[in-house]
Regions:
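Conserved small/polar residues in nucleotide/adenosyl-binding loops
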Residues: 385-387
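Inter-helical loop and helix-membrane interface segments of multi-pass membrane transporters/permeases
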Residues: 3, 32-36, 71-91, 105-160, ...
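Loop-to-transmembrane helix boundary motifs in multi-pass membrane proteins
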Residues: 5, 11-13, 19, 141, ...
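Membrane-interface "cap" regions at the ends of multi-pass membrane proteins
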Residues: 1-27, 56-61, 65-90, 245-249
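Membrane-embedded translocation segments of transport machinery
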Residues: 2, 6, 168, 172-320, ...
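Extracellular loop-to-transmembrane helix junctions
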Residues: 4, 33-59, 143-144
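Transmembrane helix-boundary motif of multi-pass solute transporters/channels
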Residues: 11-48, 235-241, 252-255, 259-260, ...
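Membrane-water interface regions at transmembrane-helix termini and the short interhelical loops
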Residues: 32-36, 84-100, 135-139, 150-174, ...
């Protein structure tokens, strides 16, 4: 039976970009750009993106298109006799499930904060109270678990509708809204009084700062970001290659996806740094940037409730686009390996993902004594390199 395809090239590009565009584009990329010399770091990053990231995206698309299967079976069909490339499927499958253990939980945080900001829960709070709200959420396993389950059900529900009617149709709308929201938020931040120094900090090439931070460290950060920003290495993009028709150029599609991913990461900095500098609030990285620093920024901003709501809507779309894309990959693992129906694959994986996500939910409260990377670390720290 012929494999289902996307109904349009735009749909393929937006969904593949949605898989690549993750939370790390917002809470990691802008910070390391500012930390390692602004535009000087971006130049190094772009070099690695061209010589490492882009070729691997092309390779993943090629493997998917040649096999017409997910990473669960692609190398079984393509490998030379006697080789062991098929063993990579276990790494790919494990990588997708592990990534979703964290992403579904953090996606729930984004949805919760969207509703909290929409209701005006942060209005009038000082910095300490905003931080207390985040700590309170982490201490509530029922609240986090509930939103995690909602995210899992919503995103698998999209996948259950099929590639064209579900994944493509809904992700296209989310990605277009995401890009529009980014432009609106970036323009608003850049015109804030006092935001100019933030733009200078972010965009001005400062090779002296790169040397001061350590050339080796900056190069390693650029190398790592170029690899992980595109969600490569776990077969997440290979599944979309399996839907590409032979009339399309793989390199051209890979360039489009890479450019969109880079654009979103770059524009995130245009949102964050001018706003933080305008209100003299330190821009940090990681979850604290999103859930503590930026709510404080919005509290200082005229119309902050509206801008905060739009920001967390944008972040929810960024999280959901990745989750839906990876869920589509996970479902394909099941259907390719077992030949089961789409409905059965969805139902089984809903249960699997919810159970596997519980350690992340409980790792901040009931299981908080578990420190996987040493004292002071949490379960979420295992995933921060990627997201």
């Amino acid at each position: 039976m012929e494999r289902e395809k996307f109904s349009s090239r735009l749909g393929f590009i937006l969904i593949s970009a949605g898989c690549a565009i993750g939370l790390g584009n917002v809470w990691r990329f802008p910070y390391i750009v500012g930390e390692y010399g602004g535009a000087a770091f971006v130049l190094v990053y772009l070099v690695f993106l061209l010589i490492l990231g882009l070729p691997i995206v092309v390779m993943e698309f090629a493997v998917g298109r040649a096999s017409r299967k997910s990473a669960a079976l692609s190398f079984d069909l393509l490998e030379p006799k006697g080789s062991r490339w098929h063993l990579t499927k276990y790494i790919a499958m494990a990588g997708n499930y592990i990534l979703m253990m964290f992403y579904t939980t953090v996606g729930g945080w984004m949805m919760l904060y969207f509703f909290k900001t929409l209701k005006g829960d942060f209005g009038g709070m000082d910095a300490e109270a905003v931080a207390g709200e985040f700590v309170s959420m982490l201490a509530n396993p029922a609240l986090m678990g509930g939103f995690m389950v909602i995210v899992v059900l919503l995103c698998f529900g999209v996948c259950a509708m099929g590639l064209q009617k579900g994944v493509e149709r809904i992700t296209k709308v989310m990605m277009v809204c995401l890009l529009v929201l980014m432009v609106v938020l970036a323009v608003h931040s850049m015109v804030l009084p006092g935001g100019g120094p933030g733009l200078e900090f972010y965009l001005k090439p400062d090779f002296g700062k790169m040397v001061e931070s350590g050339i080796g460290e900056a190069v390693f950060a650029a190398l790592g970001q170029s690899f992980f920003t595109l969600s490569i290495g776990i077969g997440a993009l290979a599944i979309f290659g399996s839907y590409i028709g032979k009339e399309r150029t793989l390199t051209g599609e890979a360039v489009s996806v890479t450019l969109l991913d880079t654009l979103v990461a770059f524009m995130a900095g245009l949102i964050i740094f001018p706003a933080c500098f305008a209100y003299n609030i330190e821009a940090k990285s990681g979850p604290s940037l999103i859930f503590i620093t930026l709510p404080n920024v919005f509290n200082h901003m005229a119309g902050g409730r509206i801008w905060g709501t739009l920001f967390f809507l944008f972040m929810s779309f960024a999280a959901f686009s990745t989750i839906i894309a990876v869920f589509q990959n996970i479902i394909s693992f099941a259907t390719d390996l077992t030949g089961c129906t789409l409905k059965k694959a969805v139902l089984c994986n809903i249960a699997a993902i919810i159970i596997l996500s519980l350690p992340c939910v409980l790792g901040f409260n009931l299981w908080s004594s578990f420190a996987p990377l040493g004292e002071g670390s949490t379960v979420l720290d295992l995933s921060l390199i990627h997201i």
